[in-house]
Amino acid sequence: MDILHRIGIQNATPEKVYDAITTLDGLSDWWTEKTEGETGLGGVIAFRFIPGGFDMKVTELDPGRLVRWEVVDGPPEWIGTTIRWDLEQRGDYTIVLFKHEGWREPVEFMHHCSTKWATYLMSLKQLVETGEGAPSPRDVAISDWH
């Protein structure tokens, strides 16, 4: 089972969006301020939230087109899943097709994560379009789980 989202980022090149997804500064400006690690191929990036977090291994990079990570540590539901970002220029927009692939079953946590991914993707869009995102802990609280 997969979580799927699509956003369009206006007046931004795929390379600019790619940089926001593949650099520590970019990631900490839209996803979580507590981001560290190695963002190159084979590197592991640690993302920390209140509470908890997860580690992602960078498994594929195609500049301006594709980013793929494998979850190597974190909540049991996430371990072994993959995060994929496909980027494509369409007119004045960079289209981002986002996939969190490989969920074993549609547990309540998957529902929560799907909504949180949507809020973080809007933060990515906001960052690239305006220069300011809404990363954790300044993100939108969607429920009692945050």
Model-derived features: positions:
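Hydrophobic ligand-binding cavity/cleft-lining segments
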Residues: 1-36, 146
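Intrinsic-disorder/low-complexity, polar/charged segments enriched in Ser/Thr/Lys/Arg/Asp/Glu/Gln
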Residues: 2-6, 44, 53, 66, ...
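Hydrophobic/aromatic beta-strand elements that line small-molecule binding cavities or substrate pockets
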Residues: 6-8, 56-60, 81-88
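A short, structured loop/turn motif at beta-sheet edges
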Residues: 14-15, 59-65, 86-95
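Hydrophobic pocket/interface hotspot
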Residues: 17-18, 27, 45, 58, ...
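Glycine-rich portal/gate segments that line the openings of hydrophobic small-molecule binding cavities
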Residues: 28-74
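Beta-strand/loop substructures that line and gate deep hydrophobic ligand-binding cavities in soluble
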Residues: 75-126, 135-137
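Short, highly charged C-terminal tails/helix-capping segments
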Residues: 126-146
